[in-house]
Curated annotation (Swiss-Prot):
Catalytic activity line of the entry: GDP-alpha-D-mannose = GDP-4-dehydro-alpha-D-rhamnose + H2O
Upper classification of the organism: Bacteria, Pseudomonadati, Pseudomonadota, Gammaproteobacteria, Vibrionales
Family the UniProt entry places it in: Belongs to the NAD(P)-dependent epimerase/dehydratase family. GDP-mannose 4,6-dehydratase subfamily.
Xref: SUPFAM superfamilies: NAD(P)-binding Rossmann-fold domains
Signal peptide positions (record): none
Function: Catalyzes the conversion of GDP-D-mannose to GDP-4-dehydro-6-deoxy-D-mannose.
HAMAP family linked to this entry: GDP_Man_dehydratase
Protein name per its UniProtKB record: GDP-mannose 4,6-dehydratase
InterPro entries (alphabetical): GDP_Man_deHydtase, NAD(P)-bd_dom, NAD(P)-bd_dom_sf
Keywords: Lyase, NADP
Entry cofactors: NADP(+)
Entry keyword annotation includes NADP: yes
Pathway: Nucleotide-sugar biosynthesis; GDP-L-fucose biosynthesis via de novo pathway; GDP-L-fucose from GDP-alpha-D-mannose: step 1/2
NADP recorded as keyword: yes
């Protein structure tokens, strides 16, 4: 019998990579996607299987973390061996604008899943993975951050995720469920949402290089982050559910860099050298050298990075650096893709899209505008 996995957030970055990973291991993979007026399955279209075909291994269900009856029905139908709760309102800035919705999805959504598993009598047979977040550490109390570091959340998103973290621990201890938290530090890929900072950088600079945009507007470029590749991190998520006993783990690389450095690497992949001048809101990124033919729209002296105060958070998280030593010692997990390799991959994918759009624009066609 194939193992069955249920993934919430299957159409997102992590969900799509995890679905690929589990399918390669012979799982029957069920994913929950939200109803929308337009298709939102681009990240999983390449693994789509016709549900009318016998023995389909990848099945999508309409669902929502805000609807307990819906979640209960799906769990009752699938009876999964493993549940990966990756669905969330995961944008920190958006959580300040929509705090109640963020709490309903990220905090209560986790509770709804756990309670449905318990009420259906699956608590002894279904393993549960919760995608937790390094944003729990917020105003960091120690560096690097490990599993025992105290939490100090600094956004409605982080507060909602803290509730989810502790309700997972509570159900594990109260009902003997195999339920665990993976405290994920920042992880990226070409499938990262376009409004997240790394993808905003790679997509924005690729568009600027092709003449589709004029400038990349940033917030806090001094912020320090521990970045890894989503492919490495979903492998760790699976490993966490293959142990005899459930435990919580930090998932990180143990190395940190600034947002400014990520901008510099991205520009370099386009053959562009940037120099930053000025301080605070007056800081600018200026082109000082160009090599190759990947940035035909740029010339030396162009200002391509500026600060927009709108992108500063109400409460900043200045530094995040994970300590993955427990994951390495207990599970043998180490990341295989470096942050520089990941950055190069992201830039090249966004450059391909920008080049196509530039060609369309040249021939008089409309092209998509950038999103903030």
């Amino acid at each position: 019998m194939k193992k069955k996995a249920l993934i919430t957030g299957v159409t997102g970055q992590d969900g799509s990579y995890l679905a690929e990973f589990l399918l390669a291991k012979g799982y029957e993979v069920h994913g929950i996607k939200r109803r929308a007026s337009s298709f939102n399955t681009q990240r999983v279209d390449h693994i789509y299987q016709d549900p009318h075909v016998d023995n389909a291994s990848f099945i999508l269900h309409y669902g929502d973390l805000t609807d307990s009856s819906n979640l209960t029905r799906i769990l009752q139908e699938v009876k999964p061996d493993e549940v990966y709760n990756l669905g969330a309102q995961s944008h920190v800035a958006v959580s300040f604008e929509s705090p109640e919705y963020t709490a309903d999805v990220d905090a209560m959504g986790t509770l709804r899943l756990l309670e449905a598993i318990r009420l259906l009598g699956l608590e002894k047979t279904t393993k549960f993975y919760q995608a937790s977040t390094s944003e729990l550490y917020g105003l960091v109390q120690e560096t690097p951050q490990k599993e025992t570091t105290p939490f100090y959340p600094r956004s409605p998103y982080a507060v909602a995720k803290m509730y989810a973290y502790w309700i997972v621990v509570n159900y594990r201890e109260s009902y003997g469920m195999y339920a665990c938290n993976g405290i994920l530090f920042n992880h990226e890929s070409p499938r990262r949402g376009e409004t997240f900072v790394t993808r905003k950088i790679t997509r924005g600079l690729a568009n600027i290089a092709q003449g589709l945009e004029k400038c990349l507007y940033m917030g806090n470029m001094d912020a320090l982050r521990d970045w890894g590749h989503a492919k490495d991190y979903v492998r760790m998520q699976w490993m966490m559910l293959q142990q005899d006993q459930p435990e919580d783990f930090v998932i990180a690389t143990g190395v940190q860099y600034s947002v400014r450095q990520f901008i510099e690497w991205s520009a370099k992949e386009l053959g562009v050298t940037l120099t930053f001048e000025g301080q605070g809101v007056d800081e600018k990124g200026i082109v000082t050298a160009i090599e190759g033919d990947k940035a035909p729209a740029l010339k030396v002296g162009d200002v391509v990075v500026q600060i927009d105060p709108r992108y500063f958070r109400p409460a900043e998280v200045e530094t995040l650096l994970g300590d993955p030593s427990k994951a390495k010692q207990k599970l043998g997990w180490t990341p295989e893709i470096t942050v520089q390799e990941m950055c190069a991959e992201m830039v090249m994918e966004d450059l391909k899209v920008a080049q196509r759009h530039a060609l369309l624009k040249l021939h008089g066609h409309d092209v998509p505008v950038s999103v903030e």
